[in-house]
Structures are given as C-alpha cells and as structure tokens.
Amino acid sequence: MIRRIESVLELHREEFKKEIIEKDSSFSDENIEKLFETDKEKALEKIEALKKRIKQYETNKLPFYNKSGWTLKSILAESTSQVETNFREYINSFSSNIDEIIDKFDYRTTITKVVKEKRLSSIIELVAEEDFSPKRLSNIEMGYVYENLIQMFSQDDAKDTGEHFTPREIIRIMVDLMEIDFDPETAKKAITLYDPACGTGGMLSIAKEHLIDKAKTKEGMKNTEDLVILNGQELLSQNYAVCKADMILKGETNSNITHGNSLIPDIESIEDDGDQHAGLHFDYMLSNPPFGVDWSEYKEHVEKLGTSRYAWGKVGADN
C-alpha cells in the first residue's frame, strides 16, 4: 500500500518538475550538471531549491502528500541503524487522509512487530524497487492484488465475517442489469451510486468504469468522471482502508466512503459506528452484503431503527 501511494506521488513529482523547468530552465538536469563543474555549492543549493518547490507543488495541488522528503529507497540508503526511525518519520508525515488509512491497517503496530523480528529493512527492500505506478498497474489491477492478499490471510475468518469478494465478471453483469440512465455525452446532472457493504470498492469502481466505457469522446469521459458520484460504507477496517486509498489515488474527490456498520443507527448510545449515510437518498444501489452472518450482537441496535428501515420485517439473527 505504501509503495503504491509513493509510486503515484513520484509520477506527480515528475510532472511538477517538468512544470518548474519550463518556467525556469536553470533547474534542468543539464544546467545543474554544468553548475556542478564551476560551483558545487551553488549546484547543491539549486537541487535543494528544486526539491522545496516540488514539495510546495505537492502539498498545494494534490489531495494527498508526504512532507518528510523520504522515500523507501532513500530510507534504505541511509544508515541501517536509522531505518526504523526514518521509516516511522516517513509514515507519520503523510496527509491526514492517508494517515487515516494507515491507522485502519493498524500499520504502526505491524511495524513494531516487524522490527522485533528484525525484518523491517528486508521488507522495505523487497518493495522499494517495485513499479506499482498506475502506468504499470491500473487501479482495478491493484485492487486484485489487495483482494488476493486479504483473501490469502483471512480465508479462515471469511465465513464468519461474510467477507467474500465478488468476481469482476459478476459485477459487470450486475451493472448491466441496473440499466443506469446516464448518457455520458449529454448528461448535465450528477447521479449517485451507493454500496452499503462496499468492501474494497470493486462494485462502485466497476460501475463507474462501465459508464465511462460508454463515452464516445474525451469530453464524455470527463463528463462521466465528474458527474458519477460514488458512495459507500464498509465495516471491516482493512477493506475500508483499501477502498478509501483507491478513491484517493484515483482522484475521486467527490466520493463519500465511510467506515462503520450500515445496518445499525449511528447514535451516541451505541459504541460502534453506525450508518453514516442516514437520511441521504441515492439514484442507484448495488451490493453483495454479508449474507448468512450472525447479527445477534447487533439485534438490540437494529430494533432501534424500527419500521423506518425494516418495515417489511427482519430475518433471524443467525442469518
């Protein structure tokens, strides 16, 4: 996850660097190399000034950033005795939206465990050179990676949690059956899609992809990207973190992905986070909810919703 975020930031930094050089050619690699030959100190100052400008671009223009100046590669290049300290500084320097994702993954606790096993450097080394940029792996392909890893390490628990991943092919059929009324070329009004048990966000992402694929022009694609608003809620922290990260990295600034149990009310008397979309209305909804999961521990909370949501009755608490 961290390497994916870093890879996306690296692409943006390259773009920012090009913009800066177009405005001031003295920052080009060629001119800095020439400056090195005559005045090494000024050349180093120029490099630091360029880094500072790129960092300003990053924090001002992107919905997420890292203000530490570290990368996984540069952490490894420093003293081996400082790897943990520098890595923690790196992790703690992300913007608040990425920091929330790190928390949901319980990443800092994992770092402590890995350090105790003396494996932090080897794990960083394993991923630092990998190209996880969108140029090599699309967001959907990266979703496959996340889902396969989560499945691999949670298969024993999946039956109890209702955590099952819907194949992409099935999602596409579901989206086709919805017959969403939206013309990418002529639409003027936004439409909203909602998944109350969104997992890693596959259904929402593919639903939007499906509509983008209908566009015949670049304007139609842009129109769809702007007007199709994704909304979702997920109970399991890691799945929520993956979904949230995916939306941020894709630039889905209008999306509304929340964490909690969408089946219970969100009120102070209940410790768990409940429905974060109460009172909202959506144009279309699709989902693969956790069928067959025992919800007896939430029964009392569900009853508080009364007929407002479950007017037609409720299934047994063991299903």
Regions found by a protein language model. Name each.
Residues M1-F182, N256, S262:
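Non-catalytic, mostly N-terminal accessory regions of nucleic-acid modification and defense proteins
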Residues E117, G279, D318-N319:
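Short, solvent-exposed loop/helix junctions and linker helices
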Residues S122, D160-E163, T186-K189, G232, ...:
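Alpha-helix N-cap/helix-initiation motif
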Residues Q155-D160, I191-L193, E225-L230, R309-V315:
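Glycine- and acidic
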Residues H164-Y284, G292-D294:
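Conserved S-adenosyl-L-methionine
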Residues N288:
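Conserved active-site aspartate in kinases
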Residues F291-N319:
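Mobile active-site "lid"/loop adjacent to the S-adenosyl-L-methionine
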